[in-house]
Every structure is written in C-alpha cells, then in structure tokens.
Amino acid sequence: KKKITSKTKAIIPVHIAGYSENLSEIYKFAKKKNLRVIEDAAHAFGSKYKKKLIGSFGDIACFSFDGIKNITSGEGGCLVSRDKKIIKNAKDIRLLGVKNDTEKRYSGHRSWITDVEQQGWRYHMSDINAAIGIAQFKRFKNLSKKRRLLCKVYDERFKYSKIISYFDIDYNITCPHI
C-alpha cells in the first residue's frame, strides 16, 4: 500500500505455487484507489479463492501455458477479461498490430493484404501450440488429480524435515504448481 502513488494504474497480485493472494482485500483497496487489478495467475490455473476459479475475479488475469505450468501448450499463455475494450485492444496488438482475423486465413480472403493501424507485439501462439493446449484442457482434471496426489506424497515424506518447510495446503481449493 505504501508503494501506491498518483502514477499507479494497477495492482498485480501474483499467485505463487497455486496459492491465491487475499483477493478480497486487494480488490477492496483497488476500488478505493480507482485502480485496475491484473492477476498473474501463471502458477494458479485450476486453483480457487472463495469457491471461484482464480482469474475469474476482476479486470484482467494472465495465465502461462509454458512447459512447466499446471497446463501446457509447449509455450504461450492466455489473457482473460470481461472488459470488451481490453480484449479488443489485446486482439489489435497481438499479431504485430496486423488487423486481419485469424479465421480469414482459411476463408479465401487475400491474407497477404494486411492492415496495421498501430504498433503491436507478437503475443499470439502458433496453431500447433493451441492444439496441444486444447488437448491438455481435456486432460486437466486427471492431471491436477495426479499433481495433488504427488504433493500429498511430498508433504508426507518431508513433514518431519528440519530443513524443508512448506505451506499448509488445502488441496480442495489449490491446484499446486510443482
């Protein structure tokens, strides 16, 4: 709270290892200060806070689908928001500012003719990575069940360790990132 200035535009809570931040307090403070909240949910895909999935609370949430995350597409990620203006802006800049819709590539549209209305970046994933991600979504329930089981084994094996400490985990709401 001490770091907030008149230049601050957003708060970015980072959910580490599947654990959520205290989102109620963060959103209450953000609303009071008229700030956006951008959740970094790269480690928390499948985790919950107050019975709702992480990433479903506020302005923007970002997920990573890198090879070591809870769900993978090899590389890439996802930005989610209920704000149509944010989504439109993200779509406008995701492919180096090129405005053509992805669907037009396969509809006979002359895909070599492009409109660039603003500077953009390469924020899109390849079709191959997207296909891998879709397949992983279908397997997520089983993958997260195995991940939770593995974590319980680690918890049991290390619970008496004098050099390793760990969080007290509620596996009903946490999808651990290990």
Regions found by a protein language model. Name each.
Residues 10-14, 19-25, 32, 48, ...:
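PLP-dependent aminotransferase class I/II
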Residues 1-73, 78-88:
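Active-site phosphate-binding strand-loop segment of PLP-dependent enzymes
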